[in-house]
Amino acid sequence: MTKVPTLEEILRAFCNPSPDLINDFTRSAQLNHASRYDTIVAQDQICDRFIILRSGMTRIVHRTDDSEDTLLFGTSGDVFTAMQSYVYGKPSRLGVEAITRSEYWAISYHRFRSMTECYPELITWLSNYLMGQTATLEDFYLTLKSKSAEERLLRLIDREHSYFEPEKFDKLTKIVPSRILAQYLGITPSSLSRIRKNLIERAKRQNNAT
């Protein structure tokens, strides 16, 4: 079972918070619940809060009149906000949708800005978080351009293992619908099905050889 992070742990991941900041941050965060496929942040609307995922899984999605793209997935401890809204007061270019039943904390921009005036380390937290997000997006872009769909799938299943375990894929597809997973990989659902079949057959051959 995935460990559910505390707000203190999320703060400490990107700064050295004072006890007062931890207390104030915790009091300011409102816990919300989302059902599967609920919209947490609406595309093309002004976002007015930071979203911190406590449990569950979300996706960052972009829609046009005739297409839909899944850009990234979010899990426990991930933070999201629309920087177009936070910096410029403009509508969000992206949306956030729950893939599973999820819990998330929300902190309004107004409250967050008030806290930055009292706690400079919160600015450090935001800066370090944004640098981490930039690094993640760079990695995602390079992986998308330089790796095959099969390699991208293996990376998503388990970043720490270079081999394929069929049960990992089965677990992932029970959480993430094939349509959404194919969007993320930049392939069609039928191509995803072929890749899955090839990987499972390869894994069986490797198991038989040992």
Q: How would you name each of these model-derived features?
A:
Residues 1-36, 79, 85:
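Cyclic nucleotide-binding regulatory module and flanking cytosolic helices
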Residues 30, 57-62, 104:
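Short beta-strand segments in beta-sandwich/barrel cores
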Residues 37, 48-59, 76-77:
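Glycine- and acidic-residue-biased ligand/ion/polar-headgroup-sensing regions
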Residues 40-45:
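Short phosphate-coordinating micro-motif centered on Lys-Gly-acidic
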Residues 72-128:
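Cyclic-nucleotide recognition modules
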Residues 73, 107, 136-139, 152-171:
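Functional cleft and adjacent loop/helix regions within the main domain
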Residues 111-148, 152:
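A small-molecule sensor/coupling module
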Residues 156-210:
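Phosphate-/nucleic-acid-contacting segments
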